Regions:
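Amphipathic, non-transmembrane alpha-helical scaffold segments
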Residues: 26-30, 34, 73, 115, ...
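Active-site phosphate/pyrophosphate-handling residues
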Residues: 24, 53, 139
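Charged, amphipathic alpha-helical coiled-coil/dimerization segments
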Residues: 5, 85-146
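N-terminal leader segment of winged-helix/HTH proteins
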Residues: 1-45, 170
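N-terminal helix-turn-helix DNA-binding core of bacterial DNA-binding proteins
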Residues: 31, 35-79, 91, 160
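C-terminal regulatory/oligomerization modules of transcriptional regulators
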Residues: 1-16, 136-170
Length: 170
């Protein structure tokens, strides 16, 4: 195979350590769980992981708005809006006009039934990854993950402030 003259055929001298780069490991774990869950949910219910997350958020916080779901599950509002449309079309949720433009979301009886049918699939993923950990290790892991999430939120707030300030000198 002949490479173009501007192709770099060797690894870069400074790269992440793929075996010890924590964000990569977290992403691999998350992606693996999401892929498995998505396959099962699509096959059994014709719904995906994002739809499940929206159903779950509404089950946890009845009356939540799409914007609040977006913040709660940390996904783009467009993804939530698409799921809200799908779930509404399937009569799994209803929207109730709130003040202004926002709408509160509630499960219907069919939505509550769907939640209860989907829940074991999500819980199975948790069982799989935590099977070899003691209850104390699970508690420690969850505490560490909550700390990491808190740091990420701080970083996002810093980035937002930086974006508001505009570009610096070039």
């Amino acid at each position: 195979m002949e490479l173009p003259p501007d192709a770099i055929p060797t690894p870069m001298p400074t790269v992440i350590d793929a075996n010890d780069f924590t964000p990569r490991l977290l992403a691999l774990l998350s992606n693996s769980l999401v892929w498995r869950e998505s396959q099962v949910l699509r096959r059994r219910f014709g719904l995906g992981t994002n739809d499940w997350r929206v159903i779950s958020a509404i089950a946890i916080r009845p009356g939540i708005t799409a914007s609040e779901i977006s913040e709660f599950i940390v996904v783009n509002k467009a993804i939530v809006s698409k799921s809200v449309g799908v779930l509404g079309d399937r009569r799994l949720i209803v929207q109730v006009e709130d003040t202004g433009r926002s709408r509160q979301l509630f499960l219907t009886p069919a939505g509550a039934e769907m939640h209860d049918a989907m829940l074991p699939i999500s819980m199975r993923g948790q069982e799989i990854i935590l099977a070899d950990l003691s209850p104390e290790e699970v508690d420690r892991l969850n505490a560490l993950l909550r700390r990491l999430l808190s740091r990420v939120r701080e970083l996002q707030a810093e980035d937002t402030l930086e974006d508001l300030r505009g570009p610096g000198p070039v």
